[in-house]
């Protein structure tokens, strides 16, 4: 198989220099969750598109990695929360290997946050409260889709949705038992700020012996 000629696409020439800000130990919060809150609020205030979008990486029982974009739906001192179908590929991965990595990329701010940690399901009460806050179409979609399973064509999905709309017409939509939330409880959080000459700032928090340890990593 021949490779695409890089001279046509100039992929090797695609680069930018980062010059906006620095990230110094003396300026960050000792608590990485509070530091994340500060950066997240700045991303929201900058009106970035979907600042809560994050890459979620998981690994299957046979060591096959996979990654996808999901939306952060909450965070606190216990961790970072997202919701999905428990029977999806990521759900099956997490049932067998309950560890994950998250990545936030805020290009306009030249910032990245990496998170690694153990994953647990959130409580039924938390999941119920969030499901009931979702738009009605999203609630129906959670029933209509057998996420990650092969489907014949789009019409099948549309027909399922139409049938569900009729079934639950003028009544509340219950939460599917196969749908709910996960919390990634971090043991590592790294903050990355782009700098000139590829000498980026990387500050990494590691949780050890009941406390967070802050270290600078080489770029």
Swiss-Prot record:
Catalytic activity: pyridoxamine 5'-phosphate + O2 + H2O = pyridoxal 5'-phosphate + H2O2 + NH4(+); pyridoxine 5'-phosphate + O2 = pyridoxal 5'-phosphate + H2O2
Residues noted as binding substrate in the record, renumbered to the chain: 15-18, 73, 130, 134, 138, 198-200
Domain of life: Bacteria
Binding note for cofactor: Binds 1 FMN per subunit.
Cofactor(s) this protein cannot do without: FMN
A single GO molecular function term of this UniProt record: pyridoxamine phosphate oxidase activity
Purpose: Catalyzes the oxidation of either pyridoxine 5'-phosphate (PNP) or pyridoxamine 5'-phosphate (PMP) into pyridoxal 5'-phosphate (PLP).
Family, per entry: Belongs to the pyridoxamine 5'-phosphate oxidase family.
Protein known as: Pyridoxine/pyridoxamine 5'-phosphate oxidase
């Amino acid at each position: 198989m021949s490779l695409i000629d890089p001279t046509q696409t100039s992929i090797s020439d695609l680069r930018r220099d980062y010059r906006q800000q620095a990230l110094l130990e003396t300026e960050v919060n000792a608590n990485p969750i509070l530091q994340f809150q500060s950066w997240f609020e700045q991303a929201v205030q900058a009106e970035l598109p979907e600042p809560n979008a994050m890459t979620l990486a998981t690994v299957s029982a046979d060591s096959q990695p996979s990654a996808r974009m999901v939306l952060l739906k909450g965070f606190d001192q216990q961790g970072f929360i997202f919701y999905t179908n428990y029977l999806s590929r990521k759900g099956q991965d997490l049932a067998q290997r309950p560890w994950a990595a998250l990545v936030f990329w805020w290009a306009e701010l030249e910032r990245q946050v990496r998170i690694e940690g153990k994953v647990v399901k959130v409580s039924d009460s938390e999941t119920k409260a969030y499901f009931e806050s979702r738009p009605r179409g999203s609630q129906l979609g959670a029933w209509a889709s057998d996420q990650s399973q092969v489907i014949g064509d789009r019409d099948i999905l549309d027909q399922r949705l139409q049938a569900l709309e009729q079934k639950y017409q003028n009544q509340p939509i219950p939460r599917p038992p196969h749908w709910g939330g996960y919390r990634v409880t971090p043991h590592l959080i790294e903050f990355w700020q782009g700098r000139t000459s590829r000498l980026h700032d990387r500050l990494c928090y590691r949780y050890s012996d009941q406390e967070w340890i802050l270290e600078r990593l080489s770029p």
